[in-house]
Amino acid sequence: MKVVAFERSVQGTGASRRLRNSGKTPGIIYGGAAEPKMIELDHNALWHALKKEAFHSSILELEVAGKSEQALLRAFQMHPFKPLVLHVDFQRVSANDKIHVKVPLHFMNQETAPGVKLGHGIVNHILNDLEVSCLPADLPEFIEVDLAAVELNQTVHLSDIKLPKGVTVITHGDDNPAVASISQPAGAVSEAAEGGEAAGETPAA
C-alpha cells in the first residue's frame, strides 16, 4: 500500500494547528540508520486509509519528496470528539531485520461450524489479533482461524492455528492462549438450569 507524504520543516503546537487547518496531518518517520524525519500528509487520504485493516498491519511504501521507504504504521492520535487525525507515526523497516507487529485474526467458517449450525451455539472471539515476529517480507495481512470442525463448548487455542511460514507468535507468558470458543447463549444456559430445577422439585404432601 502506497502512502504519499511531504517533508515538514516547521514544528511546534502553532505550526501543527495551522497545518491541520489547511487539511494536512503532521507526522514523523523514524527508525533504521536514517535520522527521524518530520512529515505531513493529506488528512482526508490518511483518514480513509486508517479505515482499512491492511493499513495497520502491512508494510507500507511511504513516499517522501519522491523517495520511497518501507515503513509500518506505529501510532496515530485522534481528536477526542472530532473526526480528526492529529498526528501519525511511521517506523522504517529493513528487509533483514525482524519486526514485531499485531496482525488481525480472520475467523473462517463461523456460520457453518458444527457448534453453531447443529449445536446452536455462538462464537466468542477471545483474541482479535496476535503479536507476531517475522521478517518484513513474511508479514501476513491477517491470520486465519478455521472454525470448520469446532463443536459446541470447544475452545480453539493458538496451537490449533496454522501460522504462515516465517511467522512466530509472541505470547507474553501464556504459550498456548485461547483464541476463540463456541458456547451456548446465556439465555439457553439459564433456561436449561431452570428446567432441571423444575424437574427435580417434589410436590408438597
Curated annotation (Swiss-Prot):
Gene Ontology CC, one term: cytosolic large ribosomal subunit
GO MF term (any one): structural constituent of ribosome
Bias (Low complexity) ranges: 186-205
InterPro entries reported in the protein's UniProt record: Rbsml_bL25/Gln-tRNA_synth_N (IPR020056), Ribosomal_bL25/Gln-tRNA_synth (IPR011035), Ribosomal_bL25_b-dom (IPR020057), Ribosomal_bL25_C (IPR037121), Ribosomal_bL25_long (IPR001021), Ribosomal_bL25_short (IPR020055), Ribosomal_L25_dom (IPR029751), Ribosomal_uL5_bac-type (IPR020930)
Keywords: Ribonucleoprotein, Ribosomal protein, RNA-binding, rRNA-binding
Assembly behavior: Part of the 50S ribosomal subunit; part of the 5S rRNA/L5/L18/L25 subcomplex. Contacts the 5S rRNA. Binds to the 5S rRNA independently of L5 and L18.
Function description: This is one of the proteins that binds to the 5S RNA in the ribosome where it forms part of the central protuberance.
Record family assignment: Belongs to the bacterial ribosomal protein bL25 family. CTC subfamily.
Protein's recorded name: Large ribosomal subunit protein bL25
Organism lineage string: Bacteria, Pseudomonadati, Pseudomonadota, Betaproteobacteria, Burkholderiales
Gene name of the record: rplY
